[in-house]
């Protein structure tokens, strides 16, 4: 009888991660069958998508509330299917708000439930890890400091590295990136990344444009590239340029190409998030800037216990790059922070060494290590019940 694995990936990044995992498991278990909720990359690996992962996509709290009944119905229908089919294992890929509820009920049915990509429990106070302990048979972590948190709570855990570290070259090619983007080789380039969400671009675009204006006044040879993920975010940034009367600034907007823009750049101004990790893997000096609603920020400050929001600082356990948040994210402060990188080659070289060490630590063949951690859970007998020892 073929090994059967149920999976849920809730967004495009999870679809990619899960597709690599399916391929890695199949290298060890060629007859394995996969089904559940997934996207086109998973389907290209032979995944049977009962629902497309796009059905799980929500945009903010209001959208989540509006679609609660629909999403709850999908989750309960999948739970019934899994409990009836009794696959060898269930793997939830990211999407913790959807998956942890599902995993808890699947695990209590005697089916191993593995969660791939630890929620950011390290960023928040409180007892969320207690709920995770009740839900999962095994946690797969992307960052090296995470396993200790789960081990302390008695949760079986494996460190598998970060998939971006496997993909990104250890030595990025700035010249090739500039050639690809038709950027000059004899000037300094600043990449401006105001975020992928419309709310982020609305919040940061005007500030980033004024920052660019200040830098252009100081450096006649400077240029700016702004990769934007969608037509909507591009339109918002264009509106901000028009409102700022900034037609004279050497700012070039790109559709996508965020990695290429950062590779081509001398320094990066980036909203906190995965893009800051990408900038670190590309060994680029950066300034992290973020602005959210005042009540959200107060809540975040009350709940958070880490002194940083940016992944480069969190992973290095040190303030290696500036973070300017909320009211501190003024054009003057951002321009001054970027200027310090532009004027200090030694500091940039030292930072590149820190980021190189981080890159090597995260480069672990994520899909292969994740598959190796999952394999012991496959082909369990029907009588198997989860326990600290067997998990």
Swiss-Prot record:
It comes from the Bacteria. Gene3D superfamilies: Glycogen Phosphorylase B (3.40.50.2000). One of its GO terms (biological process) is lipid A biosynthetic process. Its EC number is 2.4.1.182. GO terms for cellular component: membrane. It catalyses: a lipid X + a UDP-2-N,3-O-bis[(3R)-3-hydroxyacyl]-alpha-D-glucosamine = a lipid A disaccharide + UDP + H(+). Keywords: Glycosyltransferase, Lipid A biosynthesis, Lipid biosynthesis, Lipid metabolism, Transferase. GO terms for molecular function: lipid-A-disaccharide synthase activity; phospholipid binding. Transmembrane segments: none annotated. Pathway: Bacterial outer membrane biogenesis; LPS lipid A biosynthesis. Belongs to the LpxB family. Condensation of UDP-2,3-diacylglucosamine and 2,3-diacylglucosamine-1-phosphate to form lipid A disaccharide, a precursor of lipid A, a phosphorylated glycolipid that anchors the lipopolysaccharide to the outer membrane of the cell. This is Lipid-A-disaccharide synthase. It comes from Aromatoleum aromaticum (strain DSM 19018 / LMG 30748 / EbN1) (Azoarcus sp. (strain EbN1)).
């Amino acid at each position: 009888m073929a090994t059967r694995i149920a999976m849920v990936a809730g967004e495009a990044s999870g679809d990619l991660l899960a597709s690599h995992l399916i391929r890695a498991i199949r290298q060890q278990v060629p007859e394995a069958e996969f089904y559940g909720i997934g996207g086109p990359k998973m389907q290209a690996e032979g995944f049977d998508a009962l629902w497309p992962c796009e059905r799980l996509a929500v945009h903010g709290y209001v959208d989540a509330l509006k679609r609660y009944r629909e999403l709850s119905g999908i989750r309960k229908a999948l739970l019934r299917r899994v409990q009836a089919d009794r696959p060898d294992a269930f793997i939830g890929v990211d999407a913790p708000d959807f998956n942890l509820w599902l995993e808890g009920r699947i695990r209590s049915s005697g089916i191993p439930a593995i969660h791939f990509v630890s929620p950011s429990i390290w960023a928040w106070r409180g007892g969320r890890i207690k709920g995770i302990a009740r839900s999962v048979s095994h946690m797969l972590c992307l960052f090296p400091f995470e396993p200790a948190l789960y081990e302390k709570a008695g949760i079986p855990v494996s460190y598998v590295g970060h998939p971006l570290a496997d993909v990104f070259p250890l030595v990025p090619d700035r010249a090739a990136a500039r050639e690809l983007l038709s950027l000059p080789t004899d000037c300094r380039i600043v990449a401006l990344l105001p975020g992928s969400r419309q709310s982020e671009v609305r919040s940061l675009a005007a500030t980033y444009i004024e920052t660019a204006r200040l830098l252009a006044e100081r450096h006649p040879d400077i240029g700016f590239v702004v990769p934007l993920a969608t037509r909507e975010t591009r339109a918002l940034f264009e509106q901000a340029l028009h409102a700022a009367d900034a037609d004279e600034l050497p700012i070039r907007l790109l559709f996508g190409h965020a990695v290429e823009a950062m590779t081509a750049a001398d320094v990066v101004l980036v909203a906190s998030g995965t893009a800051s990790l990408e900038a670190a893997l590309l060994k680029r000096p950066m300034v992290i800037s973020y602005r959210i609603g005042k009540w959200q920020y107060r809540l975040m400050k009350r709940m958070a216990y880490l002194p940083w929001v940016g992944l480069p600082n969190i992973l290095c356990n040190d303030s290696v790059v500036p973070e300017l948040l909320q009211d501190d994210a003024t054009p003057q402060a951002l321009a001054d922070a970027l200027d310090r990188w532009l004027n200090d080659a030694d500091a940039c070289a030292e930072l590149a060494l820190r980021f190189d060490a981080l890159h090597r630590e995260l480069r672990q063949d994520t899909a292969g290590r994740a598959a190796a951690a999952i394999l012991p859970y496959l082909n369990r007998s029907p009588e198997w019940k989860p326990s600290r020892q067997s998990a």
